[in-house]
């Protein structure tokens, strides 16, 4: 019987995917506490499952901040369990910890996903507090790692949201000749979902993305465009957004810009020009 671990990380609160009101009120601590260093029951349970675990799924944003996780993984190596264990390791590429990389490299196989959702100043905007220069330096280290440890595949995973949808062709084409590149969707909160965009804006996005010369990108983007055209859940929309989802997009983006001294308009001028008629 295959055991499935899922270990979630901390340090995702400052991205644009964090809920705005949670960010303001700092109400995301409960989820973090479940895998905090002090939650002995959690870590003891993982230790008990360790001898039987065959697949361990470690989600980002940045799991290298969960230091006790690597104590567990080192224990697996010391006990010999690692020889039969496959890991999936999702990182936002903001930290390179050589000690932890050395631990991961000893497992039977590790699938690395580098979660990078924008280029240059777009990245800095979406992942507030992190910088493109640091991510690029770490990305290059992961590329070197992939060339050394062929049994451990390294891929780039682009999470598609309303902040980067207009530019995903450019992001994909930047990475596709360096590492395998694929997409993931930002489903929640609803006001970062590409489903929330106005219909006319969706059409402009479609027209731009379908001009790509990359056959692989065109295959990958087809289900994204289909997803974008789906309707938002009426039940979720009415409950969480009594004034509508799009007004919340404008409100949360504008207020976070003021708080963080950022500018959606200046960072994404081409996209904002399309959105501006609806930005009120």
For the regions a protein language model found, what residue spans apply to each?
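Core AdoMet radical
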Residues: 1-39, 50-66, 79-98, 105-137, ...
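Generic intrinsically disordered, low-complexity segments enriched for polar/acidic and small residues
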Residues: 14-20, 25, 32, 39, ...
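Short, well-ordered amphipathic alpha-helices
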Residues: 42-43, 69-77, 135-144
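An active-site-proximal structural segment forming one wall of the substrate-binding cleft
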Residues: 45-47
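Distinct, well-ordered alpha-helical segments
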Residues: 68-74, 98-104, 167-169
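Conserved C-terminal portion of the radical SAM core fold
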Residues: 109-113, 133-279
């Amino acid at each position: 019987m295959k055991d499935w671990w899922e270990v979630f990380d901390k340090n995702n609160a400052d991205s644009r995917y964090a809920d705005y009101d949670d960010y303001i009120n700092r109400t995301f601590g409960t989820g973090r506490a479940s895998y905090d260093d002090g939650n002995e029951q959690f870590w003891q349970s993982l230790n008990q499952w360790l001898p039987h675990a065959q697949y361990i799924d470690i989600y980002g944003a940045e799991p290298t901040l969960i230091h006790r996780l690597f104590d567990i993984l080192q224990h697996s190596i010391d006990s010999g369990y690692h020889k039969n264990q496959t890991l999936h390791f999702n990182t936002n590429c903001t930290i390179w910890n050589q000690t932890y990389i050395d631990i991961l490299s000893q497992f039977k196989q590790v699938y690395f996903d580098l979660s990078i959702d924008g280029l240059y100043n777009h990245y800095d905007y979406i992942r507030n507090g992190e910088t493109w220069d640091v991510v690029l330096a770490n990305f290059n280290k992961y590329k070197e790692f992939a060339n050394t440890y062929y049994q451990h595949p390294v891929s780039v995973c682009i999470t598609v949201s309303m902040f980067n949808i207009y530019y995903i062709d450019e992001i994909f084409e930047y990475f596709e000749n360096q590492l395998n590149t694929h997409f993931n969707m930002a489903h929640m909160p609803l006001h970062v979902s590409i489903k929330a965009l106005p219909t006319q804006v969706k059409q402009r996005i479609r027209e731009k993305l379908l001009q790509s010369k990359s056959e692989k990108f065109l295959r990958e983007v087809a289900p994204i465009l289909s997803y974008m055209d789906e309707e938002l859940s009426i039940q979720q929309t009415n409950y969480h957004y009594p004034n509508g989802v799009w007004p919340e997009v404008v409100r949360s983006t504008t207020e976070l810009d003021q708080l963080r001294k950022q500018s959606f308009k200046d960072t994404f001028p081409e996209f904002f020009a399309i959105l501006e008629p609806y930005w009120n």
